[in-house]
């Protein structure tokens, strides 16, 4: 379980997060929703250790994120799949390449295994093989979202 307790974060003296607490259960789809500019991205970047909270704790299975080594934090980031409002796809990569990207960065898979895993994830979101060679600008916004979902599940994260 990821447990966030009383998180506070400011930038340039402006409070972005104030006394935020939440729990994320492994194997469940967790959602953070709110108005534009409400701090959702800052919150999630704090949860995965990209931002250090000024106050509060982020606990992974009871261990405080700030007490973990860089290697441990990197491993934890692989266990959290995140989707944002924008699809955040790489325009220079094909649909298949976008889904393979996290596998190339964080897995020990062979090229063939990465391609098979990416194709499996794309099939799970009903993106047909004839779309795999296309670039994000060549597919609809809905298809782009599905590619982003496939990429988020590619590493089989504990938390989504």
Model region roles, listed by residue range:
Residues 33-35:
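The feature captures the beta-strand-to-loop junction immediately N-terminal to the Walker
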Residues 48:
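Helix-to-loop junction immediately C-terminal to a conserved catalytic motif
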Residues 56-64:
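Conserved ABC transporter NBD signature motif
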Residues 63-64, 112-130:
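Conserved ABC ATPase "signature" region
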Residues 93-101:
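Short coil-to-helix segment of the ABC ATPase nucleotide-binding domain corresponding to the Q-loop/switch region
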Residues 134-139, 143:
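Conserved ABC ATPase signature
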């Amino acid at each position: 379980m990821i447990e966030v307790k009383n998180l506070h974060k400011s930038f340039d003296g402006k409070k972005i997060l104030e006394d935020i607490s939440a729990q994320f259960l492994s194997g469940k789809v967790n959602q953070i929703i709110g108005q534009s500019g409400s701090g959702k991205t800052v919150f999630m970047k704090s949860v995965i250790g990209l931002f250090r909270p000024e106050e509060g704790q982020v606990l992974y299975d009871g261990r405080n994120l700030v007490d973990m080594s860089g290697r441990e934090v990197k491993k934890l980031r692989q266990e959290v799949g995140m989707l944002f409002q924008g699809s955040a796809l790489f325009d220079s990569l094909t649909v298949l390449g976008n889904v393979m990207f996290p596998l190339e960065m964080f897995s020990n898979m062979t090229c063939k295994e990465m391609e098979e895993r990416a194709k499996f994830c794309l099939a799970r979101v009903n993106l047909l093989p004839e779309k795999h060679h296309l670039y994000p600008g060549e597919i609809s916004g809905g298809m782009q979202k599905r590619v982003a979902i496939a990429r988020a599940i590619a590493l089989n994260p504990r938390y989504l």
